[in-house]
């Protein structure tokens, strides 16, 4: 009987924790039934794209005009953007005898309904504007009728291409394993047998240096299941990472990526700048952005059916607008919501390039990056769309010992960040639990007073509706093992995503508020403040009708958090709206070193009266 009860409980946990509201059709491209596509080209219909050559001024993004003429217009006609431009069955992966190859083997990288042009339904003529990014291959556009569920190919356009499809693009900065290191990761079409990748960099008044880059990629066979192995597959190109070492603290550096071809010529990227990290414990102004579950948007309005990540562009644009006042960003899981449609990783890195090329863009693993049955993930859902962590671990760098175990520590000036991986076991006795305790225990709080815990799923507290139904207002098994660590090592704030809203607790320990103050905390540590900040872009999650006393601020809207450390004693917390950047919730912590040392409940080792 006990065994049957345990099996039922585990099934419930998987269902609640893996699906939640996230199991919906959350990737626009997944709505297209690729296997149902048939061919019925209309001799009087045509579609034409211009300009033919893109990026002639060095751009990696360009707008194109798509002219359509269709003598039989319908409200469900749509235009798909395909890359590579040749997308018929001749490009299909080999199939066994039991599997019938579809007419088209891959999903488009984006699509738009023809009726987006106001006169299309009246005249059958339309001009659509698409924004294309350099994705290492040419493009063609296809006109379909029959909607997304029963599409029929009517006409195919000419091909267009960037002047150099292989060019190095979309740099992503990350903290290295040492405080004076910064890594640069980027994407190109150059394999190491064709060109040697490197980064050239310098600070003002010094000679430039070159750092070699390692090159990685992944293949269809690296994916765990569909759609990543099937219609969602697209060659990711080559991902290069260089480590810039021996950086001086808090100085501005200029860099660019290069590929030296076999003939000795060099293909260069644009120039970029960043500010190096402060020395651990350095007393200087330090500003941190934290959010989860942003996903991506389309500036051209394509994929317009999909309102799954309606806040994504607003969050991105607010960060770009305030970039001069940001030092580092943490995107804590559910990064792209590509869900097995590999082309969307390029789309996302292009969207965040203005941010990620300028400040370290640190990521954590979420269910939409990692989860797949029988793949070693803690949850058995299919939220990754068959990616099982591979694109996230390859496309972004982070200072983990093992990329497949997505947990790491990061030091930035007066901050210590302990980043957990909720898609692997975190409970007491696990390898990750040991890491978390080491990360929390090893920080010198005199030098780094601000101790931050980060995880994707809510291992702490949330009044989200489905956590309320589950009964404990947390990810099942979430805080039972960890709360004694947060208390013992006096974690100031714990951040989570996964739940798509904003919520802040009181300083809390074992379900009890340890401090009734709401906006100004001072003196000795009493308990960890838990913050859900998963409302950066994806569809919003509703709150439970129950509101425990520990929940002191909730917001059903899109936003992100900014932490500002003024010195070793003063920290400002701000929750900002993505729509306008306005501060909607805030508090301050003032805590001197003697307050950090002060013994509170369950936070100090046993003492002796011996002299």
Swiss-Prot record:
<dbReference type="InterPro" id="IPR041792">
    <property type="entry name" value="MPP_PAP"/>
</dbReference>
<feature type="signal peptide">
    <location>
        <begin position="1"/>
        <end position="18"/>
    </location>
</feature>
<dbReference type="InterPro" id="IPR040974">
    <property type="entry name" value="Fn3_PAP"/>
</dbReference>
<dbReference type="Pfam" id="PF14008">
    <property type="entry name" value="Metallophos_C"/>
</dbReference>
<feature type="binding site">
    <location>
        <position position="334"/>
    </location>
    <ligand>
        <name>Zn(2+)</name>
    </ligand>
</feature>
<feature type="binding site">
    <location>
        <position position="498"/>
    </location>
    <ligand>
        <name>Zn(2+)</name>
    </ligand>
</feature>
<protein>
    <recommendedName>
        <fullName>Probable inactive purple acid phosphatase 27</fullName>
    </recommendedName>
</protein>
<dbReference type="InterPro" id="IPR029052">
    <property type="entry name" value="Metallo-depent_PP-like"/>
</dbReference>
<comment type="subunit">
    <text>Homodimer.</text>
</comment>
<feature type="glycosylation site" description="N-linked (GlcNAc...) asparagine">
    <location>
        <position position="314"/>
    </location>
</feature>
<keyword id="KW-0479">Metal-binding</keyword>
<feature type="binding site">
    <location>
        <position position="367"/>
    </location>
    <ligand>
        <name>substrate</name>
    </ligand>
</feature>
<dbReference type="GO" id="GO:0046872">
    <property type="term" value="F:metal ion binding"/>
</dbReference>
<keyword id="KW-0732">Signal</keyword>
<dbReference type="Pfam" id="PF17808">
    <property type="entry name" value="fn3_PAP"/>
</dbReference>
<dbReference type="Pfam" id="PF00149">
    <property type="entry name" value="Metallophos"/>
</dbReference>
<keyword id="KW-0862">Zinc</keyword>
<feature type="binding site">
    <location>
        <position position="293"/>
    </location>
    <ligand>
        <name>Fe cation</name>
    </ligand>
</feature>
<feature type="glycosylation site" description="N-linked (GlcNAc...) asparagine">
    <location>
        <position position="263"/>
    </location>
</feature>
<dbReference type="Pfam" id="PF16656">
    <property type="entry name" value="Pur_ac_phosph_N"/>
</dbReference>
<feature type="glycosylation site" description="N-linked (GlcNAc...) asparagine">
    <location>
        <position position="271"/>
    </location>
</feature>
<keyword id="KW-0325">Glycoprotein</keyword>
<feature type="binding site">
    <location>
        <position position="334"/>
    </location>
    <ligand>
        <name>Fe cation</name>
    </ligand>
</feature>
<feature type="binding site">
    <location>
        <position position="367"/>
    </location>
    <ligand>
        <name>Zn(2+)</name>
    </ligand>
</feature>
<dbReference type="InterPro" id="IPR025733">
    <property type="entry name" value="Purple_acid_PPase_C_dom"/>
</dbReference>
<dbReference type="InterPro" id="IPR004843">
    <property type="entry name" value="Calcineurin-like_PHP_ApaH"/>
</dbReference>
<comment type="similarity">
    <text>Belongs to the metallophosphoesterase superfamily. Purple acid phosphatase family.</text>
</comment>
<dbReference type="GO" id="GO:0005576">
    <property type="term" value="C:extracellular region"/>
</dbReference>
<dbReference type="InterPro" id="IPR008963">
    <property type="entry name" value="Purple_acid_Pase-like_N"/>
</dbReference>
<dbReference type="GO" id="GO:0003993">
    <property type="term" value="F:acid phosphatase activity"/>
</dbReference>
<feature type="binding site">
    <location>
        <position position="337"/>
    </location>
    <ligand>
        <name>Fe cation</name>
    </ligand>
</feature>
<feature type="binding site">
    <location>
        <position position="456"/>
    </location>
    <ligand>
        <name>Zn(2+)</name>
    </ligand>
</feature>
<keyword id="KW-0408">Iron</keyword>
<keyword id="KW-0964">Secreted</keyword>
<dbReference type="InterPro" id="IPR015914">
    <property type="entry name" value="Purple_acid_Pase_N"/>
</dbReference>
<feature type="binding site">
    <location>
        <begin position="498"/>
        <end position="500"/>
    </location>
    <ligand>
        <name>substrate</name>
    </ligand>
</feature>
<feature type="binding site">
    <location>
        <position position="500"/>
    </location>
    <ligand>
        <name>Fe cation</name>
    </ligand>
</feature>
């Amino acid at each position: 009987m006990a065994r049957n009860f345990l099996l039922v409980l585990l099934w419930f946990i998987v269902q609640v924790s893996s699906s939640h509201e996230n199991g919906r059709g959350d990737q626009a491209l997944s709505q297209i039934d690729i296997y149902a596509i048939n061919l019925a080209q209309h001799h009087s219909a045509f579609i034409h794209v211009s300009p033919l050559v893109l990026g002639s001024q060095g751009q990696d993004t360009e707008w194109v005009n798509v002219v359509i003429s269709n003598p039989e217009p319908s409200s469900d006609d749509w235009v798909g953007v395909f890359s590579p431009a040749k997308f018929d069955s001749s490009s299909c992966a080999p199939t066994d005898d039991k599997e019938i190859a579809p007419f088209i083997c891959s999903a488009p990288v984006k699509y738009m309904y023809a009726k987006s042009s106001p006169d299309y339904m009246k005249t059958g003529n339309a001009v659509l504007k698409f924004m294309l990014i350099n994705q290492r291959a040419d493009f063609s556009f296809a006109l379909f009728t029959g909607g997304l569920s029963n599409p029929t190919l009517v006409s195919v356009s000419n091909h267009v291409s960037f002047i150099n499809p292989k060019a190095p693009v979309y740099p992503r900065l990350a903290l290295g394993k040492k405080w004076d290191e910064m890594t640069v990761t980027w994407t190109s079409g150059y394999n190491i047998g064709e060109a040697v990748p490197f980064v050239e960099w310098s600070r003002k008044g010094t000679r430039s240096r070159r750092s070699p880059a390692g090159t990685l990629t992944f293949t269809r066979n690296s994916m765990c299941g569909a759609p990543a192995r099937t219609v969602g597959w697209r060659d990711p190109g080559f991902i290069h990472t260089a480590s810039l070492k021996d950086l001086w603290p808090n100085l501005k550096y200029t860099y660019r990526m290069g590929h030296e071809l076999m003939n000795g010529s060099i293909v260069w990227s644009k120039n970029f700048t960043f500010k190096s990290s402060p020395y651990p414990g350095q007393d200087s102004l330090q500003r941190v952005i934290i959010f989860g579950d942003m996903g991506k948007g389309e500036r051209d309005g394509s994929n317009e059916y999909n309102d799954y990540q309606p806040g994504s562009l607003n969050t991105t644009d607010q960060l770009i607008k305030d970039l001069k006042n940001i030092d580092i960003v943490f995107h804590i899981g559910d990064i792209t919501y590509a869900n097995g449609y590999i082309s969307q990783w390029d789309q996302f890195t292009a969207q965040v390039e203005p941010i990620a090329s300028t400040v370290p863009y640190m990521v954590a693993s979420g269910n939409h990056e990692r989860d797949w049955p029988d793949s070693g993930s803690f949850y058995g859902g299919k939220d990754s769309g068959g990616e099982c962590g591979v694109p996230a671990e390859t496309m972004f760098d982070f200072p983990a010992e093992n990329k497949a175990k997505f947990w790491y520590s990061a030091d930035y000036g007066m901050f210590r960040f302990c980043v957990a991986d909720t898609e692997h076991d975190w409970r007491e006795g696990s390898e990750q639990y040991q890491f978390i305790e080491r990360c929390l225990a090893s920080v010198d709080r005199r030098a780094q007073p601000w101790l931050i815990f980060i995880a994707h799923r809510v291992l702490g507290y949330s009044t989200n509706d489905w956590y309320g139904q589950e009964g404990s207002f947390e990810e099942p098994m979430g805080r039972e093992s960890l709360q004694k660590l947060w208390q013992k090592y006096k974690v100031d704030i714990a951040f989570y995503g996964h739940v798509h809203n904003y919520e802040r607790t009181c300083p809390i320990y074992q379900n009890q508020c340890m401090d009734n103050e709401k906006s100004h905390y001072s003196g000795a540590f009493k308990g960890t403040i838990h913050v859900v900040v998963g409302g950066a872009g994806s569809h919003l999650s509703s709150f439970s009708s129950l509101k425990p006393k520990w929940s002191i601020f909730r917001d059903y809207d899109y936003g992100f958090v900014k932490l500002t450390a003024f010195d070793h004693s003063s920290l400002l917390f701000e929750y900002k709206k993505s729509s306008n950047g306005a501060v909607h919730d805030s508090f301050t912590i003032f805590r001197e070193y003697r307050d950090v040392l002060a013994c509170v409940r369950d936070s100090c080792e046993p003492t002796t009266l011996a002299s």
